[in-house]
Amino acid sequence: VASNSSARPACRRAIRALILAFLCTAITARSIAELPVPLLNSVTPMGGKIGTETEVTIVGADLDEADALHFSHPGITATLKSPNHFAVKIAPEVLVGSYDVRVVGKLGISNPRTFVAGDRPEITRTKAHDKPEAAVEVPMGSVFNGNVTAAASDYFKFPAKKGERVLIVCATKEIDSRMSPALAVHDAAGR
């Protein structure tokens, strides 16, 4: 009888070890089987003028069958035009400000990115302007949207008169950008 009672604690330890091994295997298998989470990296352009429609391109990872954009304001809506391209309408009643946009697709809903509804004319970069002779004209009082390459220079031109005060704002933080801009203003002679 004494040998039987000493075998019980050893048997219990073996059963506990088996249960623990099973649980560890089940947890590992479950984490391997989880679907990827959609990741929205960028929305271009990052905004639009209130009362207009603009074409938006999305870039990210695991955006399989992305078929909708969800905005934090019901007055901003999107229609799928082609994979990763949407027509976004900003209703006249939308207030100037920043709103969240998320992608909805086969794998669920993505992280938010910032989309700005504004009241100024919007210009979107369509080609490189990395040399002074390729500078793009930006009218006063307008917004310029575009993506930049790290450590690259872009050139813009705008009309100005001697002694006139001009305010140039690079709103990177407002649009959730990692860019740290450096601006230099020169006259037509490059001074």
Q: What are these model-derived regions, one by one?
A:
Residues V1-R13:
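N-terminal secretory signal peptides that target proteins for export/translocation
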Residues R16-T28:
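Bacterial N-terminal signal peptides
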Residues A29-A33:
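Boundary at the C-terminal end of the N-terminal hydrophobic targeting segment
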Residues R113-M140:
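Predominantly extracellular/luminal regions of secreted and cell-surface proteins
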Residues E34-A78, S82-P83, P92, V96, ...:
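Acidic, Ser/Thr/Pro-rich low-complexity intrinsically disordered segments
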